[in-house]
Structures are given as structure tokens and as C-alpha cells.
Regions:
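Alpha-helical membrane segments and immediately flanking helix-loop junctions
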Residues: 164-227, 380-471
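Juxtamembrane and boundary regions of transmembrane helices in multi-pass small-molecule transporters
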Residues: 27, 196, 221-288, 436-443, ...
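Hydrophobic alpha-helical hairpins/lids featuring a short glycine-rich hinge
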Residues: 72-161
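Intrinsically disordered, low-complexity non-transmembrane regions of multi-pass membrane transporters
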Residues: 1, 66, 77-113, 258-309, ...
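Hydrophobic transmembrane alpha-helices of multi-pass small-molecule transporters
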Residues: 1-66, 72, 280-282, 288-321, ...
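Interfacial/capping segments of alpha-helical transmembrane domains
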Residues: 49-93, 154, 330-363, 376-383, ...
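Transmembrane helical segments that form the transport core of multi-pass membrane transport proteins
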Residues: 307-407
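Hydrophobic core segments of alpha-helical transmembrane domains in multi-pass membrane transport
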Residues: 11-22, 39-51, 136-144, 216, ...
Length: 490
């Protein structure tokens, strides 16, 4: 074990200590020892599989495509509404034609070339409103149907029999966390009937998993960016998401220890579930729930769930527009400060927003054991800090430039590996807006509490992404793990 591997190992416990410093209740009797020990064991187990057992790579790749058919089904409905231009078939690019600039012999570099003589093809790309939001509507209706037939109630009860006695996690928490391995905020829809009765600790854990992991759709976009420099990236991104769930659980439980008894601490009988609203009725408007307590037919349940999914999508859009608008204003204000006369303008050119974010994330980046080289360490810290405002896409693109030699080549193999893991989660302000918007729509009766908990969950999600990076840093190069082979480089 090298010195950097040791730093990564110590960093895991350092992150737990930071979470404890911000805990709502630092009484030792409420410290979640079982969850911490089991959560770390699961992370180290997944890390050992992906770094030391190449056979596991194919299994993880298969897992990442498990929900492909579900998302294709959602796309089929969206394609009928919005058309093939905005919702193309799987594996196809959609584009529109623009005339070639007069006098130019070729198309711009960001186009796909001359599709027909004299016309350039411009990719439409992934449009959030036409691709992500229809998935929310479809899954909301589908999950409501599953609750109507009793599938998720059965799964929750089965999980509860093992999870709560063993590790003090409720069945609803486990169900929501497991869903995060495959989807994003849609995982909260999976446990929607339980949200109103969840304890603060449970709700924080569910929200934290949304921030500390990434959906299958996001992983696909990350793979398309990183594969040229990291050919074997897909199983590692899937592993990062799988490790992110236990990391979020243990960190959120340290931040907000469980001091109450969860509703799903024990199996819930069908009669008690119906009386408590744990059914497809949870996917209808709360006023209708009081007026019409009778059970819905399967068709009614699915349609009501889809209608509620539309409300969730609208709430997500509103929150996202607000948050990204505020971020834009912040960037604009700081850029204006750089135009002030010297020496103030010069000072703000140095104390820029990326540098401030880099300073903020530097201690956590050090904990991952990413490098002993100051330049590599600092630039890695800036990239991770930028994720807070820019999402992971632009930092990943910067990594590609840093590895391929476009500009200054500064990313080594170890830094590439750890950055890939650390940046993979949804721990950024854009997704904070998505989670807040969805959570308020899912459980409007706890609106004030949800907004407060989202900040705690956001912190847990951020720390979880660093913890996943620490796990990757610990396994890099030890026990015979060949970093070149792990990356898939020839």
C-alpha cells in the first residue's frame, strides 16, 4: 500500500468525522454504528469487485442497461407527442439542416458535416424537457400501477424483515436507495406513498441518495465523453453509483441520526397500508384522497399517477429555471467585478468563482489522495468545485483535454480514475433545484421541512461523492490492480 492509498483510506474516516461535526445530534448513543460499518463494507466490497475481478465488469455493464427498455418505452410516448426530431430512436442522432455559409467550403466543427450538398447537419442533442420529463410522467404512472397490484408493498415488507433488525434501515429507505442505482429523482416516486410518514432521518437519506448517485441516462452521457481516454469507464461509473448509495446512507444518518421509529421498521399489513395511504391513492391529489377513499382500478391508478407525474415535471421545471437563473446572475456579477478599475479588477480576476470553489473543495480533494503534485491536486480541486455550478459535463470535458494533451496535459492515470468517480454524482445546484421541485410536488404537506432537509441531504451527497473517490483511490494500484488494465488502455 502506497502513501496515497493510505491518504485515501484515512480520508474515508475523515469524511465521516466532518459529517459528525455537522450532525443534528452528536450524542454517542445515536451514532449509527451498524449503518456505518455495513455501508463501508458494501463500498469496499463493490470496489474490490470492480478493481480486482475483471469478470465483474461485464455484470456491471449489463446492470447499467437494465432500465433501457423502460426509458425506451417513455421515449416512445414522448416521440408521439414531440416528434422524432426532439426524441430520436435509440442509437440515432437527430439533426436539422442549415445552409452552408456563403463562401465556406466546409461546415463548422460542431456540426455533423454536409448531410446534403450545400447544407450542414446540426445536432439537436439531449433536450431535458423532451427526454427527462416524459420519463418522470411515465414512471409515475407505472409505479402507481405497481402499488395498485401490491408489488412495491410486498417488496418493502420483504426487505424490512432483514434490513431493520440488521442495520436499522427501514424497508422504504432500502427500496428508495436501490432505485437510485438505476434512476435519479424518479427513485423518490418509488417510495412516494411512504414520504408523508417518513421520519426526518429517512427523508434526508432518500434525498441524499438522489444527490450522491447518477441515473442511467446521465451515465450514458458521461461514457460518451470519457470513453476516448478511459475505454473501460462504464463499469466504473456503475460501480460509483452502487457505492454512492451506502455512502449516502451512512453520511446522512450521521448528519441526522434516527431518533424515531420508522413506519416501515416492521412489515405493514395490507389493511394498515390502505388506512395509512400506502397504496395507489398516494398518487392522487390529497384533496381527492380525503373525498374518495375507495380503491382505484388499475387503469385509474396508472392514469392518476401519470397526471401527478405531470405536476411533478412542472414543479421540476419551475425550480430548475429559478436555480439556474440565479447561478447565471452570480456568474454575471462576478464577471462584472473583473471589469472594475485596477487594482480591484485585477484582484477579482485572481479571486474568480472557479478559484473560490477550488479553495472550498481543496481539503476534501486532498482526502481522496488524488496526487502529491500540487498542480494536479489544485486543478483537480477546481474541477470538482466547478461541478457545484456547472454539473459534471464540463469538468469531464476538461479532463479529456487534460489527458489528451489539448492544452496543458496535467491529468495522470490515478487522477483520471479518482476524478471519474468523484464527479459522477448529481451533487450540483441544478440538480438541487430538480430535487426540491420534485420533493415539494411529491409531499406538499411537508414543503417547509423538505426545503430545509434538502440542504442537509445536499451536503451528504457531496461528501458521498468524495467518499466514493476515496474508495477508488484506496484500490488504485494495490493488491495487484494494474491501473492501465483498470482504465482499459492498451
Amino acid at each position: 500500500m502506497g502513501f496515497l492509498n493510505l491518504i485515501s483510506l484515512v480520508g474515508i474516516f475523515g469524511l465521516c468525522a466532518i459529517a459528525w461535526l455537522f450532525s443534528e445530534n452528536r450524542d454517542p448513543k445515536y451514532f449509527p454504528w451498524r449503518i456505518v460499518l455495513v455501508g463501508l463494507a458494501v463500498q469496499f466490497g463493490v470496489g474490490a469487485l470492480v478493481f480486482l475481478v475483471p469478470l465483474a465488469w461485464g455484470i456491471l455493464q449489463s446492470l447499467s442497461g437494465l432500465l433501457g427498455i423502460v426509458f425506451e418505452a417513455a421515449d416512445a410516448g414522448a416521440r408521439f407527442i414531440f416528434g422524432r426530431l426532439f426524441v430520436p430512436f435509440s442509437g440515432q442522432d437527430s439533426f436539422f439542416l442549415v445552409p452552408l455559409v456563403p463562401g465556406a467550403e466546409s461546415c463548422a466543427t460542431d456540426s455533423i458535416g454536409q448531410v446534403v450538398p450545400g447544407f450542414c447537419g446540426i445536432r439537436v442533442g439531449y433536450i431535458f424537457a423532451f427526454r427527462a420529463l416524459p420519463a418522470v410522467v411515465f414512471l409515475s404512472g407505472l409505479i402507481a400501477l405497481f402499488y395498485r397490484i401490491g408489488l412495491f408493498q410486498l417488496i418493502t415488507n420483504l426487505v424490512t424483515r432483514v434490513s431493520y433488525p440488521l442495520i436499522r434501515l427501514s424497508g422504504a429507505e432500502i427500496l428508495g436507495g436501490a432505485a437510485n442505482i438505476l434512476v435519479g429523482i424518479e427513485s423518490a416516486i418509488v417510495v412516494r406513498p411512504y414520504l408523508r410518514k417518513m421520519t426526518r432521518s429517512e427523508l434526508c437519506a432518500i434525498l441524499a441518495c438522489c444527490f450522491g448517485t447518477a441515473s442511467s441516462a446521465a451515465l450514458a452521457s458521461y461514457v460518451s465523453i470519457l470513453r476516448p481516454i478511459f475505454p473501460n469507464v462504464l463499469p466504473h461509473l456503475v460501480a460509483a453509483t452502487m457505492m454512492g448509495v451506502p455512502a449516502c446512507f451512512l453520511l446522512s444518518k450521521i448528519l441526522i441520526p434516527e431518533t424515531e421509529t420508522p413506519f416501515t421498521a416492521w412489515p405493514v399489513s395490507p389493511d394498515r397500508a390502505i388506512k395509512s395511504g400506502i397504496s395507489e391513492r398516494a398518487f392522487t391529489d390529497e384533496r381527492e384522497l380525503e373525498i374518495a377513499p375507495e380503491r382505484l382500478s388499475p387503469t385509474e391508478a396508472a392514469i392518476s399517477g401519470a397526471v401527478e407525474g405531470v405536476k411533478i415535471a412542472i414543479s421540476i421545471v419551475g425550480a430548475l429555471i429559478l436555480i439556474l437563473g440565479i447561478v447565471y446572475l452570480l456568474y454575471g456579477f462576478l464577471n462584472w467585478l473583473t471589469t472594475l478599475p485596477a487594482p480591484l479588477g485585477n484582484w477579482f480576476r485572481v479571486i474568480s468563482l472557479p478559484n473560490l470553489l477550488g479553495i472550498l473543495s481543496l481539503p476534501f480533494t486532498v482526502m481522496t489522495g488524488i496526487s502529491l503534485n500540487w498542480s494536479e491536486l489544485w486543478q483537480s480541486s477546481v474541477l470538482i468545485g466547478r461541478r457545484l455550478l456547472e454539473t459534471a459535463i464540463l469538468p469531464y470535458q476538461s479532463i479529456v483535454s487534460g489527458v489528451s494533451g489539448v492544452g496543458d496535459r496535467w491529468v495522470g492515470d490515478r487522477a483520471l480514475l479518482i476524478l471519474t468517480y468523484t464527479l459522477s454524482g448529481f451533487a450540483h445546484f441544478a440538480y438541487w433545484g430538480i430535487v426540491v421541485g420534485a420533493a415539494i410536488a411529491l409531499v406538499p404537506s411537508r414543503r417547509h421541512e423538505v426545503i430545509g432537509l434538502c440542504w442537509k441531504a445536499f451536503l451528504a451527497g457531496i461528501l458521498a461523492t468524495y467518499m466514493v473517490g476515496c474508495i477508488a483511490g484506496f484500490y488504485e494500484g494495490i493488491f495487484g490492480a494494474d491501473t492501465i488494465a483498470v482504465l482499459g488502455k492498451s
